[in-house]
């Protein structure tokens, strides 16, 4: 972790952007929540673990990024895994399954894609946990709802019977 922190610090000091995922893996429910440990690692990168959070936030420019797509190329895989877990209580992944899912997610057809760069209100942040909440809220605000999302929502609510 120290090597990763050092890389992040050096990149930011050299005015290079660093893209960091909120958490390891993907949430099956579609809502990836920011891992607090990730934020602590960022603070560690700047040796600010004992400094005020606000001074850390002033030093780095955290930009929440929302990525929405019309179709999920991994939807069938996710649904299958969730169904097997529901039916048997567990699911054992095949060798290279995660790698194959990542490839499918990267290169698979997504339909329309929307990317939005958000902002956070630094004044609203008084703890590392609150920072995670503020980032998550900004990401959710930036998501675009496509017709496929609306259909899925109405289908789950029993308001739509046909596909």
Task: Report each predicted region and the residues it spans.
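Membrane-interfacial terminal anchoring regions of lipid-handling membrane enzymes
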Residues: 2-18, 24-163
């Amino acid at each position: 972790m120290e090597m990763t922190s050092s890389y992040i610090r050096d990149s930011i000091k050299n005015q290079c952007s660093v893209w960091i995922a909120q958490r390891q893996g993907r949430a099956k429910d579609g809502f990836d929540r920011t891992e607090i440990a990730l934020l602590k690692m960022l603070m560690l990168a700047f040796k600010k673990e004992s400094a005020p959070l606000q001074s850390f936030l002033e030093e780095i420019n955290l930009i929440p990024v929302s990525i929405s797509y019309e179709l999920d190329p991994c939807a069938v895989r996710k649904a299958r895994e969730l169904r097997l877990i529901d039916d048997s209580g567990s699911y054992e992944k095949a060798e290279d399954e995660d790698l194959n899912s990542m490839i499918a997610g990267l290169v698979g057809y997504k339909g329309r894609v929307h990317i939005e760069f958000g902002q956070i209100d630094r004044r609203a942040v008084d703890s590392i946990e609150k920072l995670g909440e503020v980032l998550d809220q900004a990401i959710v605000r930036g998501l675009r709802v496509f017709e496929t999302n609306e259909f899925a929502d109405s289908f789950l609510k029993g308001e739509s019977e046909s596909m």
